[in-house]
Amino acid sequence: MSDEKSWFQEIHFLFPEGKDKALTFSYDDAQVYDRRLVSIFDQHDMKATFHLNSSTLDREGFVTRSEIKQLYVNHEIACHGVTHPFFNQLSQAQTVTELYEDRRALEQYSGRIVRGFSYPFGVYSDNLIETALKLGIVYSRTVNSTMDFALPTDFMRWNPTCHHDQVTDELLADFLNPPPFRGMALLYIWGHSYEFERDGKWAHIHGICEKLQGRKDIWYATNIEIYDYVTAVRGLIMSVDGHILYNASARPVWFMTSGKMYCLAAGEQMSFD
């Protein structure tokens, strides 16, 4: 083999518009405190994913079916099981029903395609993952904090950076001031909106948003937007010598090579001499 360094060894993929950081939030259970949390996110131009249990909608203390289309208009709606069950205590038939009916109901109420999921109580198994994939789920969030900013290797075992209680000034400083070798960095924060009310910590989420808002180097995205983009990056087709790159996906992909940034459009092929 040639000792010459291949072009593809120098490529550095980036988030949309050439940004090197991404931020996403994920909140479960759809209690009425989602209304206040959504307002805070919208005020600061944040993007989040809200995981809903379709059977609790309209119950006291929870958001209503009629409001979710407008309430979450700037955010993603995702599954959390019809009844928030312990999936390790269900039969296979119950597992299918919990996933399928939750997805069906949420799509009906929201008018959108629902593809995301988060594991109630953080409980999951290989069988649950296999079943979810067959039912059209493409990613699912755990409750296992990594305390880092790495992209997930397995979107069906998507470990977040941390719960919002674990967000510190030191963590944010590490995210915002990366070493040059880090590459694409994702800060993924999760929790429940009722925790801010219960613990008297609404100022905490306000502070997080204020420190992270309006930055030109951050892509503010929902969970499904992260999934779709990273999947597009990982699906790029490259020639053996690394001089031809083809984007077979339906979305543009950004990268840098030899000190120059490129945007490879959907369906585009690019050659480098």
Located regions from the model:
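A short, acidic, amphipathic alpha-helical segment used as a generic capping/interface helix at domain edges
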Residues: 169-180
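Active-site metal-binding loops of divalent metal-dependent hydrolases
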Residues: 27-30, 81, 193, 223
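Hydrophobic "anchor" residues on beta-strands that sit immediately upstream
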Residues: 24-25, 76, 218
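C-terminal domain-boundary segment and adjacent tail
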Residues: 6-15, 107, 139-148, 181, ...
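Metal-dependent polysaccharide deacetylase catalytic core of the NodB/CE4 family, i.e.
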Residues: 42-138, 144-158, 162, 184-193
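Non-membrane alpha-helical structural segments and their capping/turn regions in soluble enzymes
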Residues: 92-97, 169, 199-202
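Boundary/entry segment of secreted carbohydrate-active catalytic domains
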Residues: 1-35
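A short, Lys/Arg-enriched amphipathic alpha-helix followed by its capping loop at the start of a domain
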Residues: 40-46, 208-211
